[in-house]
Amino acid sequence: MALVPVDLPAPDALRGRWAAFAAICAARGWGRSCHADGPRWHFDDGGGNWADLVHVGDGRAVLLGHDHEYSDTYYAEAAAYFGEPETDLLAGAPEWWAPPVRAAATPESWVGFAYGFDGAQWWRAPYELDDGFASVGLPALDDARYRDLAAAFTDDAPDRVAVPDAAAFDALAAAGPDVSPDLLRRVVGPTWDAEAGAAAARRFRI
């Protein structure tokens, strides 16, 4: 079966926004919801929907995750558990996709989508079902989504002199893994832990 191309930014283009959002989350004490752990970048919305980007070497990566409401694809044990036909998310995929997908496909963490980046293009297995990726709300995907979610997550930050504008959020994303505590304070104010936020951003360095 021929793989299907997926129109998504390359991992390097996702890095800045992902790191910036992780910095915001860590600064307010929500670091588990968005973080980097070695080669794995994680995001979840706190409601059971999640996405991980796993770097597997040679410029390649696997993006996988699940939306518990909108993923109509049932992979591996999920098919038997829910009594649904299985969607083979690895059909036609090279072997390097398999380890992160199989490791994540547990009864505690169903996998609804799995995309592979070969260094130039994202791909997925052929299927017609909604895999739930669009509903996960990954803030790293584009500027508008990142700004909206970053603004929502900082809306109740105490002691800010002014509400940050789009340029302030964009500056965080442009800095990415090099976010400084001072730059982060322009968005989150003086009370949240900007040092922890900057440390979280640094973990997105490869």
Residue ranges with predicted function:
Residues 57-59, 67-68:
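Short glycine-rich, polar/acidic loop-and-turn segments at beta strand-coil junctions
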